[in-house]
């Protein structure tokens, strides 16, 4: 009887993990092709469209632009066009999704 309870407990834990994984996946899928701003450990900021991520939290941005950290707090200077960029997960400090990008939805026919 105790082994039955342990088995049920393990099964419930597995279901909770699967549900959490499914919810996280849905949130990530909703962010696909949305404009993101990623701040990195070296002070650079990359802005581009979120294309994908992996289990190591690396992020791929499309149409990416790089902004260097400026010593002058009023200007960031001209962006450098990167195109497709891979940001290693361990270099990510923060990720912001542009609200305009979240409000815009595309409807397929």
Swiss-Prot record:
Q: Which family does it belong to?
A: Belongs to the snRNP Sm proteins family.
Q: What is this protein called?
A: N-alpha-acetyltransferase 38, NatC auxiliary subunit
CDD domains documented for this protein: LSMD1
One biological process GO term for this chain? Answer: negative regulation of apoptotic process
Q: Which domain of life is it from?
A: Eukaryota
Q: Name one GO molecular function term.
A: RNA binding
Q: How does it assemble?
A: Component of the N-terminal acetyltransferase C (NatC) complex.
Where would you find this protein in the cell?
Answer: Cytoplasm; Nucleus
Q: Which UniProt keywords apply?
A: Cytoplasm, Nucleus
Cited function: Auxillary component of the N-terminal acetyltransferase C (NatC) complex which catalyzes acetylation of N-terminal methionine residues. N-terminal acetylation protects proteins from ubiquitination and degradation by the N-end rule pathway.
Domain named Sm is located at: 23-101
């Amino acid at each position: 009887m105790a082994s039955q309870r342990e088995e049920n407990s393990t099964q419930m834990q597995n279901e909770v993990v699967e549900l959490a994984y499914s919810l996280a996946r849905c949130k990530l899928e909703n962010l696909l092709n949305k404009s993101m701003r990623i701040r990195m450990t070296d002070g650079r900021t990359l802005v581009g469209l979120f294309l994908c991520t992996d289990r190591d939290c690396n992020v791929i941005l499309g149409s990416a632009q790089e902004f260097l950290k400026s010593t002058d707090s009023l200007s960031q200077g001209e962006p450098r066009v990167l195109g497709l960029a891979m940001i290693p997960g361990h270099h990510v400090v923060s990720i912001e999704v542009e609200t305009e990008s979240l409000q815009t939805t595309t409807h397929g026919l």
